[in-house]
Amino acid sequence: MKTIVLKLGGEIVHSPELDLVARDLRTLVDGWNRVAIVHGGGPQATALQKRLGLETRMVAGRRYTDEATLEVMKYVVAGQLNVDLCARLLANGVMPVGLHGASGHAVQATRRPPRVMQGAGPEPVDLGLVGDVVGFNLPLLGDLFERRYVPVLACLGCDDAGQALNINGDTVASQLAGALRADALVLVTSTPGVLRDVKDPSSRIPRITRAEFERLVADGTISGGMIPKLEESFEVLRGGARSVVILGKLSPGDLVAAVLEPGSAGTVLE
Protein backbone atom coordinates (compact mmCIF):
# COMPACT_ATOMS: atom_id res chain seq x y z
CA MET A 1 0.00 0.00 0.00
CA LYS A 2 1.31 3.42 -0.98
CA THR A 3 0.29 6.95 -0.03
CA ILE A 4 0.04 9.34 -2.98
CA VAL A 5 -0.70 13.06 -3.11
CA LEU A 6 -1.82 14.22 -6.55
CA LYS A 7 -1.67 17.93 -7.45
CA LEU A 8 -3.98 19.04 -10.25
CA GLY A 9 -3.98 22.53 -11.74
CA GLY A 10 -7.32 24.20 -12.35
CA GLU A 11 -6.83 23.85 -16.10
CA ILE A 12 -7.09 20.05 -16.00
CA VAL A 13 -10.45 19.91 -14.19
CA HIS A 14 -12.44 20.65 -17.35
CA SER A 15 -10.09 18.84 -19.75
CA PRO A 16 -10.45 15.36 -21.32
CA GLU A 17 -7.22 14.40 -19.55
CA LEU A 18 -9.10 14.30 -16.25
CA ASP A 19 -10.91 11.11 -17.28
CA LEU A 20 -7.53 9.41 -17.80
CA VAL A 21 -6.46 10.55 -14.34
CA ALA A 22 -9.73 9.35 -12.80
CA ARG A 23 -9.53 5.88 -14.32
CA ASP A 24 -5.96 5.47 -13.13
CA LEU A 25 -6.99 6.72 -9.69
CA ARG A 26 -9.64 4.03 -9.51
CA THR A 27 -7.00 1.40 -10.27
CA LEU A 28 -4.78 2.76 -7.50
CA VAL A 29 -7.60 2.92 -4.94
CA ASP A 30 -8.82 -0.55 -5.87
CA GLY A 31 -5.30 -1.72 -5.05
CA TRP A 32 -5.71 -0.30 -1.52
CA ASN A 33 -3.42 2.66 -2.13
CA ARG A 34 -4.22 5.86 -0.22
CA VAL A 35 -4.73 8.81 -2.58
CA ALA A 36 -5.38 12.48 -1.79
CA ILE A 37 -5.92 15.19 -4.41
CA VAL A 38 -5.11 18.88 -4.08
CA HIS A 39 -6.39 21.23 -6.76
CA GLY A 40 -6.02 24.89 -7.59
CA GLY A 41 -8.12 27.14 -9.77
CA GLY A 42 -6.06 30.15 -10.76
CA PRO A 43 -7.20 30.43 -14.41
CA GLN A 44 -10.88 30.13 -13.51
CA ALA A 45 -10.55 32.63 -10.65
CA THR A 46 -8.90 35.16 -12.96
CA ALA A 47 -11.64 34.67 -15.55
CA LEU A 48 -14.39 35.26 -12.97
CA GLN A 49 -12.64 38.35 -11.63
CA LYS A 50 -12.57 39.73 -15.16
CA ARG A 51 -16.29 39.03 -15.67
CA LEU A 52 -17.08 40.77 -12.38
CA GLY A 53 -14.93 43.77 -13.25
CA LEU A 54 -12.44 43.04 -10.47
CA GLU A 55 -8.72 43.62 -10.81
CA THR A 56 -6.41 40.61 -10.62
CA ARG A 57 -3.35 41.82 -8.77
CA MET A 58 -0.28 39.59 -8.86
CA VAL A 59 2.82 40.23 -6.75
CA ALA A 60 5.91 38.20 -7.67
CA GLY A 61 3.68 35.52 -9.15
CA ARG A 62 1.34 35.37 -6.14
CA ARG A 63 -2.28 36.52 -6.11
CA TYR A 64 -3.01 39.46 -3.80
CA THR A 65 -6.16 38.47 -1.93
CA ASP A 66 -8.54 41.11 -0.62
CA GLU A 67 -12.09 40.36 0.58
CA ALA A 68 -13.53 40.44 -2.95
CA THR A 69 -10.81 38.16 -4.30
CA LEU A 70 -11.33 35.72 -1.43
CA GLU A 71 -15.04 35.57 -2.30
CA VAL A 72 -14.08 34.68 -5.87
CA MET A 73 -11.75 31.94 -4.64
CA LYS A 74 -14.54 30.50 -2.49
CA TYR A 75 -16.97 30.48 -5.42
CA VAL A 76 -14.50 29.06 -7.92
CA VAL A 77 -12.09 26.82 -6.02
CA ALA A 78 -14.10 25.50 -3.07
CA GLY A 79 -17.31 25.68 -5.10
CA GLN A 80 -17.46 25.05 -8.83
CA LEU A 81 -14.11 23.35 -9.37
CA ASN A 82 -14.29 21.13 -6.31
CA VAL A 83 -17.81 19.99 -7.21
CA ASP A 84 -16.99 19.47 -10.89
CA LEU A 85 -13.82 17.56 -10.06
CA CYS A 86 -15.60 15.31 -7.56
CA ALA A 87 -18.41 14.70 -10.06
CA ARG A 88 -15.99 13.61 -12.79
CA LEU A 89 -14.19 11.31 -10.38
CA LEU A 90 -17.50 9.81 -9.26
CA ALA A 91 -18.47 9.16 -12.88
CA ASN A 92 -15.27 7.13 -13.26
CA GLY A 93 -15.87 4.92 -10.23
CA VAL A 94 -13.86 6.88 -7.65
CA MET A 95 -15.48 7.89 -4.33
CA PRO A 96 -14.30 11.47 -3.68
CA VAL A 97 -14.93 13.65 -0.64
CA GLY A 98 -14.61 17.38 -1.35
CA LEU A 99 -12.85 19.35 1.39
CA HIS A 100 -11.48 22.81 2.11
CA GLY A 101 -9.90 24.43 5.13
CA ALA A 102 -13.17 24.88 7.00
CA SER A 103 -14.23 21.24 6.42
CA GLY A 104 -13.31 19.74 9.78
CA HIS A 105 -10.32 22.11 9.73
CA ALA A 106 -8.80 19.88 7.06
CA VAL A 107 -6.25 22.55 6.07
CA GLN A 108 -5.09 24.53 9.10
CA ALA A 109 -3.52 27.90 8.39
CA THR A 110 -2.45 31.25 9.77
CA ARG A 111 -2.45 34.53 7.92
CA ARG A 112 0.90 35.16 6.29
CA PRO A 113 2.72 38.19 7.75
CA PRO A 114 4.33 40.72 5.39
CA ARG A 115 7.64 39.44 4.07
CA VAL A 116 10.27 40.36 1.50
CA MET A 117 9.60 38.48 -1.73
CA GLN A 118 12.02 37.80 -4.54
CA GLY A 119 11.12 40.00 -7.51
CA ALA A 120 8.99 42.41 -5.46
CA GLY A 121 11.61 44.87 -4.22
CA PRO A 122 13.31 45.28 -0.84
CA GLU A 123 10.22 46.10 1.26
CA PRO A 124 8.03 43.47 2.98
CA VAL A 125 4.89 42.64 0.96
CA ASP A 126 1.45 42.07 2.49
CA LEU A 127 -0.50 39.66 0.25
CA GLY A 128 -3.75 40.20 2.14
CA LEU A 129 -5.89 37.21 3.07
CA VAL A 130 -3.22 34.68 2.14
CA GLY A 131 -2.31 31.86 4.49
CA ASP A 132 0.59 29.64 5.46
CA VAL A 133 -0.19 25.99 6.20
CA VAL A 134 0.42 25.02 9.82
CA GLY A 135 -1.17 21.56 9.78
CA PHE A 136 -3.82 19.17 8.52
CA ASN A 137 -6.58 17.14 10.14
CA LEU A 138 -4.71 13.88 9.66
CA PRO A 139 -7.19 11.75 11.67
CA LEU A 140 -9.97 12.89 9.32
CA LEU A 141 -7.92 12.05 6.25
CA GLY A 142 -6.90 8.73 7.79
CA ASP A 143 -10.54 7.78 8.36
CA LEU A 144 -11.35 8.56 4.73
CA PHE A 145 -8.38 6.53 3.48
CA GLU A 146 -9.45 3.54 5.59
CA ARG A 147 -12.85 3.59 3.88
CA ARG A 148 -11.24 3.97 0.44
CA TYR A 149 -12.53 7.48 -0.11
CA VAL A 150 -10.37 10.00 -1.96
CA PRO A 151 -10.05 13.38 -0.18
CA VAL A 152 -10.19 16.23 -2.72
CA LEU A 153 -8.79 19.36 -1.11
CA ALA A 154 -9.39 22.85 -2.48
CA CYS A 155 -6.46 25.18 -1.80
CA LEU A 156 -8.22 27.24 0.87
CA GLY A 157 -7.09 27.08 4.48
CA CYS A 158 -8.75 28.29 7.65
CA ASP A 159 -7.37 29.71 10.89
CA ASP A 160 -8.55 28.95 14.42
CA ALA A 161 -10.90 31.95 14.37
CA GLY A 162 -12.69 30.67 11.27
CA GLN A 163 -11.07 33.05 8.78
CA ALA A 164 -10.72 31.47 5.35
CA LEU A 165 -7.36 32.08 3.68
CA ASN A 166 -6.15 31.68 0.11
CA ILE A 167 -3.13 29.37 -0.23
CA ASN A 168 -1.09 28.41 -3.27
CA GLY A 169 -2.13 24.94 -4.41
CA ASP A 170 1.44 23.70 -4.89
CA THR A 171 2.19 24.72 -1.31
CA VAL A 172 -0.80 22.80 0.07
CA ALA A 173 0.12 19.70 -1.95
CA SER A 174 3.79 19.83 -0.96
CA GLN A 175 3.09 20.23 2.73
CA LEU A 176 0.39 17.56 2.69
CA ALA A 177 2.83 15.14 1.07
CA GLY A 178 5.30 15.85 3.86
CA ALA A 179 2.70 15.53 6.61
CA LEU A 180 1.51 12.17 5.25
CA ARG A 181 5.09 10.98 4.59
CA ALA A 182 3.76 10.23 1.12
CA ASP A 183 5.47 7.70 -1.10
CA ALA A 184 4.95 10.11 -3.99
CA LEU A 185 3.80 13.64 -4.70
CA VAL A 186 2.62 13.59 -8.31
CA LEU A 187 2.52 16.94 -10.12
CA VAL A 188 0.39 16.79 -13.26
CA THR A 189 1.82 19.39 -15.66
CA SER A 190 1.73 20.31 -19.33
CA THR A 191 4.89 18.30 -20.15
CA PRO A 192 5.53 14.53 -19.94
CA GLY A 193 8.32 15.06 -17.43
CA VAL A 194 11.73 16.73 -17.47
CA LEU A 195 13.09 16.68 -21.02
CA ARG A 196 16.66 16.96 -22.28
CA ASP A 197 15.19 18.64 -25.37
CA VAL A 198 11.92 20.52 -24.74
CA LYS A 199 10.90 19.90 -28.36
CA ASP A 200 11.38 16.13 -28.13
CA PRO A 201 9.05 14.21 -25.76
CA SER A 202 11.18 11.09 -26.24
CA SER A 203 14.07 12.86 -24.45
CA ARG A 204 12.34 12.38 -21.08
CA ILE A 205 14.69 11.92 -18.14
CA PRO A 206 13.30 9.04 -16.03
CA ARG A 207 15.05 9.89 -12.74
CA ILE A 208 16.91 12.87 -11.32
CA THR A 209 18.85 13.19 -8.07
CA ARG A 210 19.80 16.54 -6.56
CA ALA A 211 23.37 16.18 -7.83
CA GLU A 212 22.15 15.33 -11.33
CA PHE A 213 19.78 18.32 -11.26
CA GLU A 214 22.62 20.71 -10.43
CA ARG A 215 24.73 19.26 -13.25
CA LEU A 216 21.88 19.61 -15.78
CA VAL A 217 21.31 23.23 -14.74
CA ALA A 218 25.02 23.97 -15.08
CA ASP A 219 25.19 22.58 -18.63
CA GLY A 220 21.96 24.32 -19.69
CA THR A 221 19.85 21.18 -20.17
CA ILE A 222 17.40 22.40 -17.52
CA SER A 223 16.58 26.09 -17.73
CA GLY A 224 13.87 28.71 -17.32
CA GLY A 225 10.77 28.03 -15.25
CA MET A 226 11.67 24.37 -14.76
CA ILE A 227 14.51 25.36 -12.41
CA PRO A 228 12.35 26.81 -9.59
CA LYS A 229 9.78 24.03 -10.04
CA LEU A 230 12.46 21.38 -9.49
CA GLU A 231 14.09 23.31 -6.66
CA GLU A 232 10.73 23.42 -4.86
CA SER A 233 10.25 19.72 -5.54
CA PHE A 234 13.57 18.81 -3.94
CA GLU A 235 12.50 20.81 -0.87
CA VAL A 236 9.44 18.54 -0.69
CA LEU A 237 11.79 15.57 -0.32
CA ARG A 238 13.49 17.29 2.59
CA GLY A 239 10.03 17.83 4.12
CA GLY A 240 9.25 14.13 4.39
CA ALA A 241 7.88 12.90 1.06
CA ARG A 242 9.80 9.97 -0.43
CA SER A 243 9.62 11.04 -4.07
CA VAL A 244 8.20 13.65 -6.42
CA VAL A 245 6.92 12.71 -9.87
CA ILE A 246 6.46 15.26 -12.66
CA LEU A 247 3.97 13.90 -15.15
CA GLY A 248 1.90 15.25 -18.04
CA LYS A 249 0.42 14.70 -21.51
CA LEU A 250 -0.99 11.49 -20.11
CA SER A 251 -1.74 8.23 -21.84
CA PRO A 252 -3.92 5.55 -20.22
CA GLY A 253 -2.05 3.88 -17.37
CA ASP A 254 0.65 6.55 -17.03
CA LEU A 255 -0.35 7.58 -13.51
CA VAL A 256 -0.47 3.98 -12.30
CA ALA A 257 2.90 3.26 -13.91
CA ALA A 258 4.49 6.39 -12.44
CA VAL A 259 3.42 5.38 -8.93
CA LEU A 260 3.92 1.61 -9.01
CA GLU A 261 6.91 1.49 -11.38
CA PRO A 262 8.87 4.71 -10.65
CA GLY A 263 10.72 6.00 -13.69
CA SER A 264 8.50 4.28 -16.24
CA ALA A 265 6.46 7.45 -16.85
CA GLY A 266 7.25 11.08 -16.13
CA THR A 267 10.34 12.07 -14.16
CA VAL A 268 11.01 10.92 -10.61
CA LEU A 269 12.94 13.19 -8.24
CA GLU A 270 14.60 11.29 -5.42
Curated annotation (Swiss-Prot):
InterPro entries: AceGlu_kinase-like_sf, AcgluKinase_fam, ArgB, Asp/Glu/Uridylate_kinase. Keywords: Amino-acid biosynthesis, Arginine biosynthesis, ATP-binding, Cytoplasm, Kinase, Nucleotide-binding, Transferase. The record marks K7, K229 as: Transition state stabilizer. Pfam families: AA_kinase. SUPFAM superfamilies: Carbamate kinase-like (SSF53633). PANTHER family: N-ACETYLGLUTAMATE SYNTHASE, N-ACETYLGLUTAMATE SYNTHASE, MITOCHONDRIAL. Belongs to the acetylglutamate kinase family. ArgB subfamily. This is Acetylglutamate kinase. It comes from Anaeromyxobacter dehalogenans (strain 2CP-C). The gene is argB.
